[in-house]
Amino acid sequence: MNNQNKYGVYVDSLLSKKVVLKITEIGKNIKQNLEKKIKNSIEGKCITEGFVRPNSLQVKTYSCGLVKDDHIEFIVVYKCDICNPVKGFEVECKVRNITKAGIHAEVKDQEDNVPITIFVARDHNYENKQFDTIEKDAIIGVRIIGMRFELNDPSITAIAYLLGK
């Protein structure tokens, strides 16, 4: 892959979420409690926007709370890093294992999180001579042709073509 075209897999995103705190969780540390509650529910998992990078969440603002019975509802605006690759996205990944069906690989970030697991099908690369020379733990370049994830998945699953050298 061409080094000048390399981009990270994460994008800074500004999102909002309704967060409920118990009356006992309200004090001088409201912001920390809101941040902790959001971190526990979304970091390291897939949400509708994509995979949320662990330890990237920062609360920017929050509403004055709305009292409901024994809890208080806040609307919280927060910033976090999201991974949501699109069709045609090129990325480097490490080969985890090779089967008759194809190559299973992972995209890892600097903290060893795995936002994307990739499958490179042998059928999609039957004319690529490089495919049979790839070994376990090799770093390969791929172009994503499709992906899927559901809420709370530990990573995004993608299918990809192998890029030539």
Question: What are the roles of these predicted feature ranges?
Answer:
Residues 1-165:
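Single-stranded RNA-binding regions, centering on S1/OB-family and related RNA-binding modules
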